[in-house]
Amino acid sequence: MKFSTIPGLTEVKAMLIDSVKSNHIAHAQLFLGKEGALNLPLALAYTTYLHCQNKGETDSCGTCAACVKSLKFIHPDTNFVFPLSNIKGDKDEERFKAEMLKSWRQFLIEQPFGHLDDWTNFYGGEDKQAIISREGSREIIRSLSLKPFESKFKVMLIWQPEYMHPSAANGILKILEEPPPNTFFFLITNLAERLLPTILSRTQIIQVPLLSDPEVNEYLAKKQDLEETRRQKIVQQAEGDLNFAIKLIDSEEDHNQEIFTDWMRSCFKKDYASLVGLADNFHELDKMSQRNLLYYGQTMMRETLLHRAGATEINRATGNELKFIQDFSKVMTTSKIDKANQLMNEAGYHLERNGSAKMIFLDLSIQLSAVIK
């Protein structure tokens, strides 16, 4: 991957490039961003730039032998560690690892901005918990015991280290603190608080923000043939998550406004029979649609807050959405909105970790009923 394929993030890109030019590259770096931030693409572009044999001022050349391999994710001096579900079955261990590495490379090509759930769906492990096993830490140590094959540098990319088994995390502490010469660790995470403090203390943190709405809009305008009103709505719902924006384009026109209005009406009335039925309906949705509904709900909460504050110039709702917000703001105080947002965030977290959608949405509905009324 090249820096030029990643929209926005100008300051972070410049900092990474300058570190290579000045030869001040921290041996262990943690690319930290919320889910939806482009921290994995940045780490990949940084790795490509490190290996590039004909570096430009602002990007790798894309044509040298090293770049050709890096852009296919097959450079021999770039190693990957990533979460996997236990779907090996009776396959030989080496064969299974080879198959998963091949799938990983194809995933990066097809879904360069993908999330963890996209990855587990890609290789067929969506129904099982993905982890980085103890064997993963042994693989790191084995790989780094070898000298670089073609490049001056050797890079170990660890995606989602928060999913490391505790024994795996402890297993890499020594080599993380004292890596072999010209060896770099790039850890890519959404949840630094779930990492061992001893790992955090050994890394330089690179903060990767979500994209701004104009950056997402510019990318979609260049890459997708969309009617402007629909594009703006997608940008608003995506909230800086480019991967989510792309998925929204591929999905059918949603009916979230109608669904969310009915849901909040049932919460307000404390109509528990209706809420049970809605939880059943939400359970039948695919994971993308479930997540989309929660994102939409949080968007409506934000718009309601803006309406209450009188910030009509930045309130983006129109039509039926605006009417809903005008009515909703009569019963929702700032503290209620904050609490509802927190509850939706927690529900999204549990959905991402394969909790029962029916139980998650039913519990959320009951708690929202208590907040709203």
What is the role of each PLM region?
Residues 1-51, 55-58, 65-69, 181-184, ...:
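Charged, glycine-rich active-site and insertion segments that engage polyanionic ligands
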Residues 142, 174, 201:
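Conserved adenine-binding aromatic site and its adjacent loop/helix in ATP-hydrolyzing domains
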Residues 155-159, 172, 183-189:
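Structural recognition of the conserved hydrophobic beta-strand(s) that form the central parallel beta-sheet
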Residues 145, 170-181:
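Conserved catalytic/switch belt of AAA+ P-loop NTPases
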Residues 166-170, 291:
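Conserved strand-to-helix beginnings and helix N-cap segments that scaffold or border functional pockets
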Residues 2-163, 167:
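Clamp-loader machinery-focused feature within the broader ASCE/P-loop NTPase space
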